[in-house]
């Protein structure tokens, strides 16, 4: 009859790890996902990444976490079931899921492959609800059911345990660099910070055929930046002489420092006319701009990427052998891992071995 709503079939039993409240205490959480629809893909989760965003969401830092909360916006696994109208995947395929599991599909952003800017997104990690009334729980769980449009093809030669952080750190740095044209050969890009975001930014810059200069607070990271990640140069951000010599030489800089602590005038001074400062380190306070003219330089931010960009990140990583430095952990180590993230004690990202350590029992 007109006006009636179809009751959603929430019959897929699932177990995940998350929080029941803002105390931050992590625990197993049982819940139900919807039965696969015609265009849905059912995924056995094998790996799930953990980052600072997850830690802050667990503690409701921004005030919009809905409990019980199962985190996870960097998820990799294999297809175990497909709906009858699914065209992109078959059982056994390796796949990934990023931060989005749905969007309106009608707005300007959705129509232009920028689903991440949709005003009505369905996020993977439990911060939103579907139109039908289904709660979305994150990928730190044994199973996911996702519309095939929001499922990513996983390249065969990209290890899932080393690649799963690309679904966060990778797309966060790739999307704005591509937008600014920094994916072209010959660009000189400065990277502030050499953590999870910075290390991936350097690898992508080199894959693009560019020159990467790492600017860090610690001289101890010089060997690591050059020998492990392929940076062309390294500068300590307190070395005024070196910084002076670099003024106006860079096509852009990417600030990946936690909390966006790098002074804006310092970054603007390094950038050429028409260059750009890209902020991906989630600034926690307002930044100050210099009063003098900025030479038509741009300051931009980033909010992950669209689905096309997500797939490009995985494909480029596979083509250029880009992997993340991950510490693979079991689910029982998760609380310790969150504390280590809080204390900046991880090199560089955690990947949870969901497939072998998260057991589902009826």
Curated annotation (Swiss-Prot):
Q: Where does Zn(2+) 1 bind?
A: 51, 73, 168
UniProt keyword annotation of rRNA-binding present: no
Q: Which residues bind Zn(2+) 2?
A: 104, 107, 110, 118
Annotated substrate binding lies at 73
Q: According to the record, how does the cofactor bind?
A: Binds 2 Zn(2+) ions per subunit.
Record InterPro entries: ADH-like_C, ADH-like_N, ADH_Zn_CS, CAD-like, GroES-like_sf, NAD(P)-bd_dom_sf
Known cofactor(s): Zn(2+)
* UniProt-listed Pfam families: ADH_N (PF08240), ADH_zinc_N (PF00107)
Please name the Gene3D superfamilies in this protein's record: Medium-chain alcohol dehydrogenases, catalytic domain (3.90.180.10), NAD(P)-binding Rossmann-like Domain (3.40.50.720)
> What does the record give as EC number?
1.3.1.-
Q: Where is the signal peptide?
A: none
- UniProt GO MF annotations: oxidoreductase activity, acting on the CH-OH group of donors, NAD or NADP as acceptor; zinc ion binding
Q: How does it assemble?
A: Homodimer.
Name assigned to this protein: Alcohol dehydrogenase 13
Gene this protein is translated from: ADH13
């Amino acid at each position: 009859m007109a006006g009636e709503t179809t009751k959603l079939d929430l019959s897929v039993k699932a177990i995940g790890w998350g929080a029941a409240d803002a105390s931050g205490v992590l625990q197993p959480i049982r819940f139900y996902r919807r039965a696969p629809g015609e265009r849905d893909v059912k995924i056995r989760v094998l790996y799930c990444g953990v980052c600072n965003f997850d830690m802050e969401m667990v503690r409701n830092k921004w005030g919009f976490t809905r409990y019980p909360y199962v985190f996870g916006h960097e998820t990799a696994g294999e297809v175990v079931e497909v709906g009858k109208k699914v065209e992109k995947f078959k059982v056994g395929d390796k796949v990934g899921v990023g931060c989005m599991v749905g969007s309106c599909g009608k707005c300007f952003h959705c129509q232009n492959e920028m689903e991440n800017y949709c005003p009505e997104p369905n996020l993977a990690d439990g911060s939103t609800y579907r139109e039908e009334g289904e709660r979305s729980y994150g990928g730190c769980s044994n199973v996911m059911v996702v519309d095939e449009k929001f499922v990513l093809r996983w390249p065969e030669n990209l290890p899932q345990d080393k690649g799963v952080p690309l679904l966060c750190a990778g797309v966060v740095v790739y999307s704005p660099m591509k937008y600014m044209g920094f994916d072209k050969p010959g660009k000189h890009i400065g990277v502030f910070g050499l953590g999870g975001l910075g290390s991936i930014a350097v690898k992508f810059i080199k894959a693009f055929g560019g020159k990467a200069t790492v600017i860090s607070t610690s001289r101890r990271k010089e060997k690591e930046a050059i020998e492990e990640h392929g940076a062309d140069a390294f500068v300590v951000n307190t070395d005024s002489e070196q910084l002076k010599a670099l003024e106006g030489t860079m096509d852009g800089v990417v600030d990946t420092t936690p909390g966006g602590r790098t002074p804006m005038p310092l970054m603007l001074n390094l950038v050429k006319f028409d260059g750009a400062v890209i902020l991906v380190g989630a600034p926690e306070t307002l930044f100050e701009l210099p009063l003098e003219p900025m030479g038509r330089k741009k300051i931009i931010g980033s909010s992950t990427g669209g689905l096309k960009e997500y797939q490009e990140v995985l494909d480029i990583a596979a083509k250029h052998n880009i992997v993340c430095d991950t510490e693979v952990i079991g689910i029982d180590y998760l609380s310790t891992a969150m504390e280590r993230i809080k204390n900046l004690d991880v090199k560089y990202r955690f990947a949870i071995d969901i497939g072998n350590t998260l057991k589902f029992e009826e």
